[in-house]
Amino acid sequence: MRSLSIFGATGSIGESTFDLVMRKGGPEAFRTVALTGGRNIRRLAEMARALKAELAVTAHEDCLPALREALAGTGTEVAGGAQAIAEAADRPADWTMSAIVGAAGLVPGMRALKHGRTLALANKESLVTAGQLLMRTAQENGATILPVDSEHSAVFQALAGEDTACVERVIITASGGPFRDWSLERIRACTVAEAQAHPNWSMGQRISIDSASMFNKALELIETREFFGFEPDRIEAVVHPQSIVHAMVGFCDGGLMAHLGPADMRHAIGFALNWPGRGEVPVARIDLAQIASLTFQKPDEERFPALRLARDVMAARGLSGAAFNAAKEIALDHFIAGRIGFLDMAAVVEETLAGVSTDPLFGKVPDALEEVLAMDHLARRAAEEAAGLRQQKR
């Protein structure tokens, strides 16, 4: 029986993964080694019961008594805290879903790779902050990383059986978010509620706002660089409002391979779960006649400066991605709290990158996770200062 673990089980990606696992037979088809979640103890316990999980972990130690009570008598072991999540990744599992949002997902993902696992990677911050270290760890331990972002899953599939030396360009698509047709002035004055209202995808608050600012796409550009190893000038993003084409790969013979799929994360998750084969996934089928037209346009980097900043990071490499991600997370915290404006987020990130770029770690290829965490900490402090100054100017 195949074994699996789901890190970030109660988030949107985790819920979709759980849904697919249950549809494929649940505990009759899979041995669930570990499930982790945050404060939604009730849902974590429901999942653990349904899958007969061996271990359930909450990221918050103060929630551990509630989790212990919810799973009393089930035989499921419980634990709490960041260290417990890291240790859960040391438990052998054939397939591990890494869906913890933010830099917190880096440690368990790295631990899973060190044990030679197949890692379904939905945590984009891992590649952004420590891409070179992550890919090297996978190679050294015979582990496999499967991208779960819809765009990178699309590129992965388009490249199957191809000679990457013949690839001229990789194009990932962006819906453009709720602000794709807004003026710069209107975007500057937007509210949190407006920013989190995504037109195509059903996602959590933070990733929806990242989509509105196109920081999500900026992270994905960096991911593409780190995962597939293509040079920055061969990677681009286009706005595609219909969210049907997820990525395209252009080849040296002039051919352009496009991957089309529904705007449903279960499509990419299902591919990773069924890999190296394919299996049925319960998503809507595309009716091209009904869609009638697909449109594409260049993104406006004045309204969405995150894309420009991503190109700087792709060129610098080293630990610049860790600084970029840390600053983005801090800036997003301040925007959600109402302390800075929407466009201030990019300004905070740009000022943070400038401030930490003189540190020796900034351009260094990391040798260990500790260096990644050190840059993350340094950039978070710098971003807090930059956000504080922005708040004072409002």
From Swiss-Prot:
InterPro entries hit by this protein: DXP_reductoisomerase, DXP_reductoisomerase_C, DXP_reductoisomerase_N, DXPR_C, DXPR_C_sf, NAD(P)-bd_dom_sf
Annotated metabolic or biological route of this protein: Isoprenoid biosynthesis; isopentenyl diphosphate biosynthesis via DXP pathway; isopentenyl diphosphate from 1-deoxy-D-xylulose 5-phosphate: step 1/6
EC supergroup of this enzyme: oxidoreductase
GO MF annotation list: 1-deoxy-D-xylulose-5-phosphate reductoisomerase activity; manganese ion binding; NADPH binding
SUPFAM superfamilies on file: 1-deoxy-D-xylulose-5-phosphate reductoisomerase, C-terminal domain, Glyceraldehyde-3-phosphate dehydrogenase-like, C-terminal domain, NAD(P)-binding Rossmann-fold domains
Cofactor (UniProt): Mg(2+); Mn(2+)
Alphabetical GO biological process terms: isopentenyl diphosphate biosynthetic process, methylerythritol 4-phosphate pathway involved in terpenoid biosynthetic process
Binding residues for 1-deoxy-D-xylulose 5-phosphate: 124, 150-151, 175, 198, 211, 216-217, 220
Chain positions recorded as Mn(2+) binding sites: 149, 151, 220
Reaction(s) the record says it catalyses: 2-C-methyl-D-erythritol 4-phosphate + NADP(+) = 1-deoxy-D-xylulose 5-phosphate + NADPH + H(+)
Domain of life assignment: Bacteria
Keywords tagged on the record: Isoprene biosynthesis, Manganese, Metal-binding, NADP, Oxidoreductase
Positions contributing to NADPH binding: 10-13, 38-40, 123, 125, 204
EC number: 1.1.1.267
Job of this protein: Catalyzes the NADPH-dependent rearrangement and reduction of 1-deoxy-D-xylulose-5-phosphate (DXP) to 2-C-methyl-D-erythritol 4-phosphate (MEP).
Family: Belongs to the DXR family.
Name of the protein described by the UniProt record: 1-deoxy-D-xylulose 5-phosphate reductoisomerase
